[in-house]
Regions:
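Short beta-strand/loop segment at the start of cytosolic alpha/beta domains
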Residues: 1-15
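Amphipathic alpha-helical interaction surfaces in cytosolic regulatory modules
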Residues: 20-98
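A short, charged, amphipathic alpha-helix used as a generic interaction element across diverse proteins
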Residues: 110-112
Length: 112
């Protein structure tokens, strides 16, 4: 899995490409988010528009990172979810835990 990141209007944006199914790909995303939080990032948008599928290992990383960001007083927002990814969050009842946005721009612009 390739993961890109950049800063837009002071907000860190991370965009993984592929599937969050565990293993080294999921570890790469987990490490990147941990590194951003350690560098003092206060707002991170995880753009999941090119994430084709998320399994329990991928959900575990999202939950772990949401907790880490929450404990640090930082925000982790999910944006641009595919229907499959959103279905997984809805079925697992995690869509109510995460701040989910229709687009990356909406997540960046939101002050919630």
């Amino acid at each position: 899995m390739k993961t890109e990141s950049w800063i837009i209007n002071g907000v860190n944006v991370v965009e993984p490409h592929g599937k969050l199914m565990g293993g080294s790909d999921t570890d790469d995303l987990d490490n990147r988010l941990t590194r951003l939080l350690g560098q003092g990032a206060k707002r991170v948008v995880l753009d999941l528009g090119d994430t084709k599928w998320i399994n329990s290992a991928g959900l575990g990383v999202l939950i772990h990172q949401w907790n880490a960001f929450h404990e640090a007083g930082a925000e982790l927002r999910l944006a641009n979810l595919t229907k499959k990814a959103l279905d997984v969050l809805v079925i697992s009842r995690l869509a109510t835990v995460f701040s989910c946005y229709d687009s990356r721009d909406d997540a960046i612009a939101s002050r919630a």
